Amino acid sequence: HMDSIGFTVRYQDQLVPIGGPRAVTGYQLVGEDSLGPIECELVENDGDLHYKFARGIDRGTELVFKKDFRETDDFVQSCYLDNRLGIFNALKVAETLENGVIVFSCWEEHGGGSVPYIAKFIYEEWGVRQALISDITWVTEGVLHGEGVAISMRDRNVPRRSYIDKIIGIARESGVDFQLEVEGAGSS
């Protein structure tokens, strides 16, 4: 998906989260309103979210985390890469895809998500019954860097076991290194 977690300016200096951002005082946020570019500081106080900036910011302005891009020989680190790398993967698939549908959505972080609507449309229009989602996970105690792609067996949702088994079989037949991911939160 192409949308990003962040914040919407409410009243005075109040912020409302978009998606589920981790809010820590001192994080730098960026955006732009009718008066120009914004680079402000996030302030969290007992669950209340505010910004610190030299002037008021227009209501409804979206603020996102300032990028802090880092690259080494083994890692690339920056906010929002999960979404952007998923898009890159889909574009690479598009180079050779025949008789398929690739979707770029932009409503996932705002609550509800667009996937149920898109899935219904794709099924009704073309009869497509199965889909893969290209998302980028994080390193956890069960998903290790460099050990292969993560096949999500469950997150907040539980996909059909027969479908997971089919994907695992395809990965094995193709010689793709993979790991099995089991999480209790998040959702693809």
PLM segments and residue spans:
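N-terminal hydrophobic/helix-forming segments and targeting peptides
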Residues: M2-S188
